[in-house]
């Protein structure tokens, strides 16, 4: 058995290297690539999710973290502001006196 001769497993695709085969076809020229048009500011606004103002779109760069302040809802914080037994927001109901007078 010589070079370029198939051994029964099918015809070799490398026949053009060893002779006796056709040269490979040249690749077709790819279609010219068109550059996308620059996007307008209206299209950029569509990329921002609903409910997020463009000035607050990046929540990861905040120094205090993303779970503080007006992260999603722009509502006041429900964080506990005083230690247990400390200043109460219900002092107006109980007249603010701790001795019960």
UniProtKB/Swiss-Prot annotation:
Residues 1-54, 73-101 are annotated as: Disordered. Transmembrane segments: none annotated. Keywords: Microtubule. Residues 1-22 have a biased composition (Gly residues). GO terms for biological process: cortical microtubule organization. It comes from the Eukaryota. GO terms for cellular component: cortical microtubule, transverse to long axis. Acts in maintaining the cortical microtubules organization essential for anisotropic cell growth. Belongs to the SPIRAL1 family. This is Protein SPIRAL1-like 3.
């Amino acid at each position: 058995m010589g070079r370029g001769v198939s051994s029964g497993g099918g015809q070799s695709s490398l026949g053009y290297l060893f002779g006796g085969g056709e040269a490979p076809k040249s690749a077709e020229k790819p279609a010219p690539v068109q550059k996308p048009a620059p996007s307008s500011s209206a299209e950029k606004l569509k990329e921002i999710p609903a409910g997020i103002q463009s000035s607050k779109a990046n929540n990861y760069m905040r120094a205090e973290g993303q779970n503080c302040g007006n992260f999603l809802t722009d509502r006041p914080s429900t964080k506990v502001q005083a230690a247990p037994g400390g200043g109460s927001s219900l002092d107006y109901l109980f007249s603010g006196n701790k001795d019960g007078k």
